[in-house]
Design a protein with these regions (language model features):
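Residues forming the flavin
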Residues: 1-117, 121-196, 200-516
Length: 516
C-alpha cells in the first residue's frame, strides 16, 4: 500500500522560480480556488420592477442555490415540501422502527434532501474548471463540516454531521434576508405567453403539451393550501423522487425528456472481508479506516453492471416515499464503524429499449418494481432478501448466515430472481462472479442481497438551454439531481451554484461575462 500526498506550500519568488524549473521536482503552481461572485445586488432587493427568486426544494442543490442567491443580496424564498431536518429525522427513524411512513417527510423529502441520509460522499467526476466544488466544500466547513474535507481525496461527512450543517446553512440564508418555508408543497406553476423582446413575437402552447420550440414565461407558483407567490425566476431543485411534481410540470408544458437510470439490489458483506481483500495484512490500520470499492463489468448480454453509493461500515436503509413500495439505499456515519459494508449493485437501463412509450415511463417502471418488492417482502415494508450463494444457484434462501442484515424495518428471505427483469438478474449474477476475482470474498455465499434499488438517479431530464432556463418555460431553472443534472451531494451543490449565478445575471446583469 502506498500513500500519496500533495503538499500546498507558499514560497518566495526566487525559490518558486527555481523549483518550477527543475525537471526532477514534481511541482506546479497551486490553482486559485477562491470564489468570485458573478454579480451583486447594489441596493435592497427587490425594487418595484423585480421579484424575489423562488427556490423549490432544499436538498444540496436547493441549499447551495438559495445560499448563493442570498449572498448576492437577492433574498430568495425557499419552498420545501418536507419538514425541517430535526422533524424529518424523527419521521424517518419512526418509519425504520415502526413502519409508519410519512409520505412528505422521509429519506427523500425534507430539509437536506436525500443526501442527508447517505454516506455523505463529497467527491464528484464532473468537470469543474472554476473550482465551484471548492466553494461548496468551503460553505460546508463554515457550517461545521470537518476541515479535512478540503484536502482528502475521498472526503465524506456522515448523516449526523450533515444535520447540524444543514441547520447552520439555513440560518445564514435567513440572516441574509431569505425565507425558508417547510411543509410547503408547490402544486402548480403560474405562467403567461412569452414575448420575445427582440422580435415582439408571442408564443402560445399547443394542445400537444410541452414543445422545446414553444416558450411560456413562468410568473409564480400555487401552493397546496391555495397560496399564490409571484416570481419570474424559479429554481426547480426538487430531487429525483418528486414524481408528482414531474407529472405536474409535464402537464403544464415544461419540456422534459426520459433519461437512463439503473436498477438492482444492495449487497452486504462483513466489513472485515472487504478490508482484508483490499488492504491485506494492513487491514484494520487506523490510517486506512474502512475499505471501499468501485466496480464495473460489461456483461455478455450487453448490459453494464456497477457498484453505486458504496457505504463502508454502514447500513442499508428503507428509502421509500410512497405507500406500498419498498426502496433501498445506503447510509454511513462519519465513523464508518458499523459491522457491514454495503453497496448497490445495479444494471443500467435506457428509455429506448427498457421503458419506451412516454416521458414518465421510467417512473412507471420504478413504481412497478418497488410495489413488487413490497409484496415480496410481506407487504409490511420489510425488504425481500437472499443470500448471494443462493442467488447464484437460483435457489430461495431460508436462513441467514454470517452476514447479518442491517435493513430496518426488517427483511424477508426468499427468491430475488422475481424482483427484477430477467436480463437484470442474469447480468448481476455474471457480474458478482467477476467482481469476486477483483475482491476476494465478494461472491461469498453468506453475503446478503436486499432489494430493490431503483432510485440511483432521476428517470427524467428537465431540459434547459445555455441560459440554464427550461427550453419551453422561460424563468424556470431546472437544477440538481431531480432535473437530471447532478448525481450526488457535491455535483448537486455545484449545479445549484451554476443555476443561481445564471438567475442572478438574468436579473441584475453580470460583472464577469466569462463565468456563466
Amino acid at each position: 500500500i502506498q500513500l500519496i500526498y500533495q503538499v500546498n506550500v507558499q514560497l518566495g519568488a526566487e525559490l518558486e522560480k527555481d523549483l518550477l524549473g527543475r525537471e526532477s521536482v514534481i511541482c506546479r503552481p497551486a490553482p486559485d480556488t477562491r470564489y468570485r461572485f458573478v454579480t451583486m445586488a447594489e441596493s435592497v432587493f427587490p425594487n418595484e420592477a423585480q421579484q424575489r427568486p423562488i427556490v423549490v426544494g432544499f436538498g444540496p442543490c436547493g441549499i447551495l442555490s438559495a445560499l448563493l442567491l442570498a449572498q448576492m443580496g437577492l433574498r430568495p424564498i425557499v419552498l420545501e415540501r418536507g419538514s425541517n431536518v430535526r422533524q424529518r429525522t424523527k419521521d424517518t427513524w419512526g418509519f425504520w422502527r415502526k413502519s409508519q411512513l410519512n409520505t412528505e417527510s422521509n429519506v427523500q423529502f425534507g430539509e437536506g434532501g436525500a443526501g442527508t441520509f447517505s454516506d455523505g460522499k463529497l467527491y464528484s467526476q464532473v468537470k469543474d474548471k472554476r473550482h465551484l466544488g471548492r466553494k461548496v466544500l468551503d460553505e460546508f466547513v463554515k457550517a461545521g463540516a470537518p476541515p479535512e474535507i478540503l484536502f482528502l481525496s475521498k472526503p465524506h461527512i456522515g448523516t449526523f454531521k450533515l444535520v447540524t450543517m444543514v441547520e447552520r446553512m439555513r440560518a445564514e440564508i435567513i440572516s441574509l434576508g431569505g425565507e425558508i418555508h417547510f411543509d410547503t408543497k408547490v402544486v402548480r406553476l403560474l405562467q403567461e405567453p412569452f414575448v420575445d423582446s427582440k422580435s415582439n413575437h408571442l408564443d402560445t402552447l399547443t394542445s400537444e403539451g410541452a414543445n422545446e420550440n414553444i416558450q411560456r414565461q413562468v410568473t409564480g407558483v400555487c401552493l397546496a393550501d391555495g397560496t399564490i407567490l409571484n416570481s419570474r425566476h424559479i429554481v426547480m431543485a426538487m430531487g429525483h423522487s418528486a414524481r408528482d411534481t414531474f407529472s405536474m410540470l409535464l402537464k403544464q408544458g415544461v419540456y422534459i425528456e426520459p433519461k437512463p437510470f439503473s436498477i438492482g439490489f444492495r449487497i452486504e458483506h462483513p466489513q472485515s472481508v472487504i478490508d482484508s481483500a483490499r488492504f491485506g495484512k494492513n487491514a484494520g490500520h487506523v490510517m486506512l479506516g474502512a475499505a471501499d470499492y468501485k466496480l464495473v463489468h460489461h456483461c455478455a448480454n450487453g448490459r453494464s453492471v456497477y457498484s453505486f453509493c458504496m457505504c463502508p461500515g454502514g447500513t442499508v436503509v428503507a428509502a421509500t416515499s410512497e405507500e406500498g413500495h419498498v426502496v433501498t439505499n445506503g447510509m454511513s456515519q462519519y465513523s464508518r464503524n458499523e459491522r457491514n459494508a454495503n453497496s448497490a449493485i445495479v444494471v443500467g437501463i435506457n428509455p429506448e429499449t427498457d421503458y419506451p412509450g412516454h416521458v414518465l415511463a421510467g417512473i412507471d417502471l420504478q413504481r412497478k418494481l418497488e410495489k413488487l418488492a413490497y409484496e415480496l417482502g410481506g407487504s409490511d415494508y420489510s425488504a425481500p432478501a437472499q443470500l448471494v450463494g443462493d442467488f447464484l444457484a437460483d435457489e430461495p434462501s431460508t436462513a441467514l448466515a454470517s452476514a447479518q442484515p442491517s435493513y430496518k424495518p426488517g427483511i424477508k428471505l426468499g427468491d430475488l430472481s422475481e424482483a427484477l427483469p430477467e436480463f437484470a438478474i442474469e447480468a448481476i449474477r455474471e457480474a458478482i462472479l467477476v467482481f469476486d476475482r477483483k475482491i476476494k470474498g465478494f461472491a461469498m455465499p453468506e453475503a446478503l442481497l436486499t432489494g430493490v434499488e431503483t432510485r440511483t438517479s432521476s428517470p427524467i431530464c428537465i431540459k434547459r438551454g445555455p441560459d440554464f432556463q427550461n427550453l419551453s418555460m422561460k424563468g424556470l431553472y431546472p437544477a440538481g439531481e431531480g432535473a437530471g443534472y447532478a448525481g450526488g451531494i457535491l455535483s448537486a451543490g455545484i449545479d445549484g451554484i451554476k443555476v443561481a449565478e445564471a438567475l442572478a445575471v438574468s436579473l441584475l446583469g453580470s460583472t464577469d461575462s466569462d463565468v456563466v
